[in-house]
Amino acid sequence: MRFDAEVILNAEQSKTAHLLLQGLIDGARLAGVRVTVSERYSGAAPWLMLWGVGREAPLIAREQHLAAGGRVIHWDMGYIGRGKIDAHCRVCIDHDHPWRLFERTRPDPARWETFGLDLREDASPDGHIVVACLGRKSVKMLGLEGWEDRAIKRLRQRFPGADIVRREKPTSRHVSVPPIEDVIRGARLVVCRHSNCAIDAAIAGVPFECEDGAAYWLAQRDFTPDNRLDFLRRLCWWQWRHDEAPLAWEFIKEMLCD
């Protein structure tokens, strides 16, 4: 079976994105995918590979390609192991977040176990509530101006007297924001729209509420240790280092062709 993908690679992307994308392109070719590299979307292949969830240009290209009957592989920085050059990159298909395909994702523990993380129980039933703020690009792209204020208003009605902490989204490596682990430790609840904070909460054992994002799959289930672990095992199949790209593409082909 022949696999063809168009990849958008241009000067609008960061140096880090270029390096990671090149590794993903090389991995695609090693996995038997015929890759066409374009500066602008052309619809040259049945599959389209993009970098940057929540950015305007990739979103427009994705919508055009889906409308034409194609499939879209969309990459961004990872969920766990979020670094730069040695980072894991998260992948989703046709959407911003992969939770719709979690039922088809094997809960094999192998990838999760490579992180050496244990589930924690950091929640306190009488603790504070954390509201994870949106970043500027999400506010703009999704039309969510004031989302945090509305969320806090609802929470004050539900939990009179509770301490509510706004956790601003880090906008730059030069801006100091307390580590999310410290912010949610001792919390009773984390509330976000689609933030990775929900994944941190799943690891930490702090209940969370979200409207979208990878953790939405878990949000629809009981917040038990077994379900948390099941979620994290599935999640880790949706993120890869660029040096794992051939394996990533075998997984992507399985999800696209099954």
Regions found by a protein language model. Name each.
Residues 62, 76, 82-90:
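Phosphate/adenylate-binding glycine loop and adjacent helical scaffold
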Residues 37-40, 156, 160-209, 213-214:
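Donor nucleotide-activated moiety binding/catalytic core segment of transferases
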Residues 4-10, 75-79, 126-138, 167-169, ...:
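Short loop/turn segments at strand-loop or loop-helix junctions that form parts
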Residues 38-66, 187-193:
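Short, well-ordered secondary-structure micro-motifs within conserved domains or adaptor modules
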Residues 122-173:
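Conserved catalytic-core segment of nucleotide-activated headgroup transferases in glycan assembly
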Residues 67-71, 205-206:
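A short helix->loop->beta-strand "cap" motif at the edges of active sites that frequently abuts
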Residues 1-47:
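N-terminal pre-catalytic "stem/leader" segment of glycosyltransferase-like enzymes
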Residues 84-127, 217-258:
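Leloir-type glycosyltransferase catalytic cores
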